Swiss-Prot record:
ABC transporter domain ranges (all copies): 5-255, 350-600
Residues binding ATP 1: S43, G44, S45, G46, K47, S48, A49, Y61, Q96, H213, R495, E499, G503
Native organism taxonomy: Bacteria, Bacillati, Actinomycetota, Actinomycetes, Mycobacteriales
Keyword Hydrolase: no
Phenotypic consequence of gene deletion: The uptake of glutathione is compromised in the oppDA knockout mutant. Macrophages infected with the oppD-knockout mutant produce lower amounts of TNF-alpha, IL-1 beta and IL-6 and undergo reduced apoptosis compared to the wild type.
UniProt EC number: 7.4.2.6
Name assigned to this protein: Oligopeptide transport ATP-binding protein OppD
Database matches in CDD domains: ABC_NikE_OppD_transporters
Quaternary context: The complex is composed of an ATP-binding protein (OppD), two transmembrane proteins (OppB and OppC) and a solute-binding protein (OppA).
Residues at which [4Fe-4S] cluster binds: C286, C292, C299, C317
Length: 612
């Protein structure tokens, strides 16, 4: 039986002003009918370029070589009008950002119907509209008849992604290509979208190629996985074999860096040191060698081939025998055990009582009038203790970020009270508020947006010091000390943010936040924008800083696995209220509220054995 999709020696090169960049370097794989194959790897590994080459959606300046056969038909080299007969009919595509995949000026029903009419001209408009409603029902949109008349902006993010899936399966495709289909979604919505994709596969019988960096999604959904690094496949196997008996040190590192719900608070992860190589002019040898804990001289001379190491299991490594049976912590020589917390009651550094924050709803353009209000935070009470972490979790719109902003405002709330370091913020004068701000600093979600690209690292870190009267010598000494603390080199002080990886940028943001020796750090989704291998290093750094300096963390996140590693106490928010809070081990291990149980049940676990 011939495969549904057969890719052979696929290479993708992008012409640039400098050296050409070969983003995909001779990969080969196949997808059988009804099979789910996952491409996984860090950002820049070439997985999205490899997938978009299959469907012919790369930019014009991309050079594609090799062979891509769909049911025996060669797709590479087809003219665009010929390729368009495959797109949307034989091949359905689900993109990461549904808003960019949908036209804002047409209803979602019209957009699904259009996909049917383009590829099935004999189907009339009315029949296409009826089929569009059926597809909305299939992908789980409530009241599909009415919602088919909605515009994309009138739907939630999860609903928009369901519409994109409906368009992708509208013509019963043979192959579904899903490019990070759940990345931007809340955990419960992510679980629902995976269920919809499973249903779509079962209904259409399509093979699925899914691109993701989430190893939990791979374990939950995929049958086989291709691990990509520096533009090529470095390990491929069935998902059960890959997770149980991985043979490539890179795969070991990826799995070791994943936060887990079953880990104790304070457990260190296994980060992969360094960053992926530039694909413009790779050095000889194995591209992973500079980051590999098992590297030997032979690794630096020739790039290893992808060879069989077991039945249907291949790896590109000459040291696979040193990987078998060893943990990631052992291979990467990292101590992961949680360190015992100091005993005794710690003082309360942030106390929130009956906090309320409302936003007025207004109607009209010229003569606006109030028509109601939204209670973004509805009477919540929280406590953060010295040297501890309070995790505030919940889905988008739950009120967790609003709560954090109200605390950081250091001003009288609409209702209720906020105490920071024993002071009621409603009583603060201008000078007292400025002084207190030194003790509570923020690390933002997006390290790129929080750093001025025009300033070198030294100026970025020195800015709060200079604003608070530090002298020149004192500032230089403190910046050098902060670079040491967050694991950067002194020479990095003269470089600019654009020269650093995402994880290094976040370390710069943390160094800046620590400059004035605060007692409290507010962490607003500090690792959600990072690859899992980089995220692990930041989580370890935050744990080490808390242990070293006795910092207190207010940690806002939608990622329950990350919260489990960091938080001593957890508050679960829903619709502006705290529905459950307490010790993190108790809340995660024995949740009492149905919403908490639903959140925990939706988290994809990096263990195929737990697959439902």
């Amino acid at each position: 039986m011939s495969p549904l999709l057969e890719v052979t020696d696929l290479a993708v090169t992008f012409r640039t002003d400098g050296d050409p960049v070969t983003a995909v370097r001779g990969i080969s794989y196949r997808v059988e009918p009804g099979e789910v194959v996952a491409m996984v790897g860090e950002s820049g590994s070439g997985k999205s370029a490899a997938a978009m080459a299959v469907v012919g959606l790369l930019p014009e300046y991309a050079q594609v070589r090799g062979s891509v056969r769909l049911q025996g038909t060669e797709l590479l080299g087809l003219a665009d009008n010929a390729m368009s007969r495959f797109r949307g009919k034989a091949i359905g595509t689900v993109f990461q950002d549904p808003m960019s995949a949908l036209t804002p000026v047409y209803t979602v029903g019209d957009q699904i119907a259009e996909a049917i009419e383009v590829h099935q001209p004999r189907v009339g408009k009315k029949a296409a509209r009826r089929r569009a409603v059926e597809l909305l029902d299939l992908v789980g949109i409530s009241q599909p008849q009415r919602r088919s008349r909605a515009f994309p902006h009138e739907l939630s993010g999860g609903e928009r992604q369901r519409v994109v899936i409906a368009i992708a399966i509208a013509n019963d495709p043979d192959l579904l290509i899903c490019d990070e289909p759940t990345t931007a979604l809340d955990v419960t919505v992510q679980a629902q979208i995976l269920d919809v994709l499973k249903a779509a596969r079962d209904v259409t019988g399509a093979g699925v190629l899914i691109i993701t960096h989430d190893l939990g999604v791979v374990a939950e959904f995929a049958d086989r996985a291709l691990v990509m690094y520096a533009g090529r496949v470095v390990e491929s196997a069935g998902v059960n074999d890959l997770y149980r008996d991985r043979r490539m040190p890179y795969t070991v590192g990826l799995l070791g860096s994943v936060p887990r719900l079953d880990a104790a608070q304070g457990t260190r992860l296994v980060p992969i040191p360094g960053a992926p190589p530039s694909l413009a002019g790779l050095a000889p040898g194995c591209p992973f060698a500079p980051r590999c804990p098992l590297v030997i001289d032979e690794c630096l001379t020739a790039e290893p081939e992808l060879l069989d190491v077991a039945t249907d299991h291949r790896a590109a490594c000459i040291r696979t025998e040193l990987v078998t049976g060893r943990s990631a912590a052992d291979i990467y020589r990292v101590k992961t055990e949680a360190r015992p917390a100091a005993l005794g009651d710690a003082s309360v550094v942030v106390r929130v009582r009956h906090l309320v924050k409302t936003y007025r709803l207004a109607k009209g353009v010229v003569l606006r009038r109030a028509i109601g209000e939204v209670r973004a935070v509805d009477g919540i009470s929280l406590e953060l203790r010295q040297g501890r972490t309070l995790g505030i979790v919940g889905e988008s719109g739950s009120g967790k970020s609003t709560t954090l902003h109200e605390i950081l405002e250091l001003a009288a709330p609409q209702s209720g009270s906020i105490e920071v370091l024993g002071t009621d913020v409603a009583t603060l004068g201008t000078a007292e508020r400025r002084s207190l701000r030194r003790d509570i600093q923020v690390v933002f979600q997006d390290p790129v947006a929080s750093l001025d690209p025009r300033l070198p690292v030294f100026d970025l870190i020195a800015e709060p010091l200079q604003a608070n009267g530090f002298g020149k010598n004192e500032t230089h000494a403190r910046v050098a000390e902060l670079l040491d603390i967050v694991g950067l080199r002194h020479g990095d002080a003269s470089r600019y943010p654009a020269e650093f990886s995402g994880g290094q940028k976040q370390r710069i943001g943390i160094a800046r936040a620590l400059a004035l020796q605060p007692k409290i750090l507010a962490l607003d989704e500090p690792v959600s924008a990072l690859d899992v291998s980089i995220q692990a290093g930041i989580i370890n750094l935050l744990l080490d800083l808390q242990e070293q300096f006795g910092l207190s963390y207010l940690f806002v996140s939608h990622d329950l696995s990350v919260v489990k590693h960091l938080a001593h106490q957890v508050a679960v928010m829903l619709a502006g209220t705290v529905v459950e809070q307490g010790d993190s081990e108790e809340v995660f291990g024995n949740p009492k509220h149905e919403y908490t149980r639903r959140l925990l049940g939706a988290v994809p676990q990096p263990d195929p054995a737990r697959r439902g």
